[in-house]
Amino acid sequence: MTKRWFNVGKIVNTHGIKGEVRVISKTDFAEERYKPGNTLYLFMDGRNEPVEVTVNTHRLHKQFHLLQFKERQNLNEVEELKNAIIKVPEEELGELNEGEFYFHEIIGCEVFTEEGELIGKVKEILTPGANDVWVIGRKGKKDALIPYIESVVKHIDVREKKIEIELMEGLIDE
């Protein structure tokens, strides 16, 4: 059986001379995912097999996550990692508490009002701060931005790929 991989980030550049790389994170739980000692897999152009690396250090710098790997600790050793996609296998995703979901479970879900009217599909999740914001693609209309808060999101069924929301006034531009 083929292994299922999930993107958790992309290396966009190097940082300094001590082998750190700048990562744009695409993971729901960055602090957990990039914890020192964790194993990540780098998928690079021109290579058939992923490169396995172990996180040595992790810190935030501006909008980037800076990672250093135990296997590569200087600028020359990480230069070739630019543009690598960072992934983890499905079995490393871990269990979530009730009411918690991975981004890949939410993206692609159809969003309905409590009255059953289809609004659109979740196409992206933004993480600006206090709560996540779901970007809902709508046919022939501007994308809708829905905050992931209890007063708006009423029911999520990831198996059926359906989400029900309470459509508050002004939440969606027609």
UniProtKB/Swiss-Prot annotation:
<keyword id="KW-0698">rRNA processing</keyword>
<dbReference type="GO" id="GO:0043022">
    <property type="term" value="F:ribosome binding"/>
</dbReference>
<keyword id="KW-0143">Chaperone</keyword>
<dbReference type="GO" id="GO:0030490">
    <property type="term" value="P:maturation of SSU-rRNA"/>
</dbReference>
<dbReference type="InterPro" id="IPR036976">
    <property type="entry name" value="RimM_N_sf"/>
</dbReference>
<dbReference type="InterPro" id="IPR011961">
    <property type="entry name" value="RimM"/>
</dbReference>
<dbReference type="InterPro" id="IPR011033">
    <property type="entry name" value="PRC_barrel-like_sf"/>
</dbReference>
<feature type="domain" description="PRC barrel">
    <location>
        <begin position="98"/>
        <end position="171"/>
    </location>
</feature>
<dbReference type="GO" id="GO:0005840">
    <property type="term" value="C:ribosome"/>
</dbReference>
<protein>
    <recommendedName>
        <fullName>Ribosome maturation factor RimM</fullName>
    </recommendedName>
</protein>
<dbReference type="InterPro" id="IPR002676">
    <property type="entry name" value="RimM_N"/>
</dbReference>
<keyword id="KW-0963">Cytoplasm</keyword>
<keyword id="KW-0690">Ribosome biogenesis</keyword>
<comment type="function">
    <text>An accessory protein needed during the final step in the assembly of 30S ribosomal subunit, possibly for assembly of the head region. Essential for efficient processing of 16S rRNA. May be needed both before and after RbfA during the maturation of 16S rRNA. It has affinity for free ribosomal 30S subunits but not for 70S ribosomes.</text>
</comment>
<comment type="subunit">
    <text>Binds ribosomal protein uS19.</text>
</comment>
<comment type="similarity">
    <text>Belongs to the RimM family.</text>
</comment>
<dbReference type="Pfam" id="PF05239">
    <property type="entry name" value="PRC"/>
</dbReference>
<dbReference type="GO" id="GO:0005829">
    <property type="term" value="C:cytosol"/>
</dbReference>
<dbReference type="Pfam" id="PF01782">
    <property type="entry name" value="RimM"/>
</dbReference>
<dbReference type="InterPro" id="IPR009000">
    <property type="entry name" value="Transl_B-barrel_sf"/>
</dbReference>
<dbReference type="InterPro" id="IPR027275">
    <property type="entry name" value="PRC-brl_dom"/>
</dbReference>
